[in-house]
Amino acid sequence: MGIALENVNFTYQEGTPLASAALSDVSLTIEDGSYTALIGHTGSGKSTILQLLNGLLVPSQGSVRVFDTLITSTSKNKDIRQIRKQVGLVFQFAENQIFEETVLKDVAFGPQNFGVSEEDAVKTAREKLALVGIDESLFDRSPFELSGGQMRRVAIAGILAMEPAILVLDEPTAGLDPLGRKELMTLFKKLHQSGMTIVLVTHLMDDVAEYANQVYVMEKGRLVKGGKPSDVFQDVVFMEEVQLGVPKITAFCKRLADRGVSFKRLPIKIEEFKESLNG
């Protein structure tokens, strides 16, 4: 098992008049090697969970287990530091994570911060920059001279340079054009195929259907549904009630089903729809 949340509650500014409950009795597991999507409206608790996974927050009650490390409200910084090496968190606007004077230095910073020699850190940085599609001619440039899409790739390379076992992504393609979005999602797919555990927060149900093998639905700080995307998206009415919807092809097939067309199961991918026509 990669990650397990057990009866987790979290309250921002706990013990003050401004206390705000963000999570209530959340229990879920993220298996090692899985591609898990976390979906829900703004304010549902998704981003709070991501920060718990990375140790940026600790639970008010309950526990978060990442491999062999258990995090509770009383955990020490040394335990949390270990989690941050295992779980790489890419924020929604990952370019905000950039701060060094050159692209190469920025990506090499993380490994060096965890005790890797400068020589090895630079070697790893070069490898990860190549992996995310940043040309070597840009390595000595200021990252702030790059395009928004390039800056995001540099930030992702910086996380990958720390060799995390789990990559946590908070709306990683927000604001990108369709080509840039497709290229990044393809990169994450390849990382997953290489054995990395992926946790994705997204509002795009088509991406959930295409890439994830597990999905959790959050609403108002509670976990309200979970399972395989092919199962969760069968409940079209529920997904519309929580204002998330379903993949475009699923919505189309639901309209056909309402008009008498028979499906054994509603397709969640175009390929499944084509197969249903041939079957």
Swiss-Prot record:
It is a peripheral membrane protein. The keyword Nucleus does not apply. InterPro entries: AAA+_ATPase, ABC_transporter-like_ATP-bd, ABC_transporter-like_CS, ABC_transpr_CbiO/EcfA_su, ECF_ABC_transporter_ATP-bd, EcfA2, P-loop_NTPase. Pfam families: ABC_tran (PF00005). Residues 3-245 form the ABC transporter domain. The keyword ATP-binding applies. Its EC number is 7.-.-.-. One of its GO terms (molecular function) is ATP hydrolysis activity. Keywords: ATP-binding, Cell membrane, Membrane, Nucleotide-binding, Translocase, Transport. Belongs to the ABC transporter superfamily. Energy-coupling factor EcfA family. This is Energy-coupling factor transporter ATP-binding protein EcfA2. It comes from Streptococcus pneumoniae serotype 4 (strain ATCC BAA-334 / TIGR4).
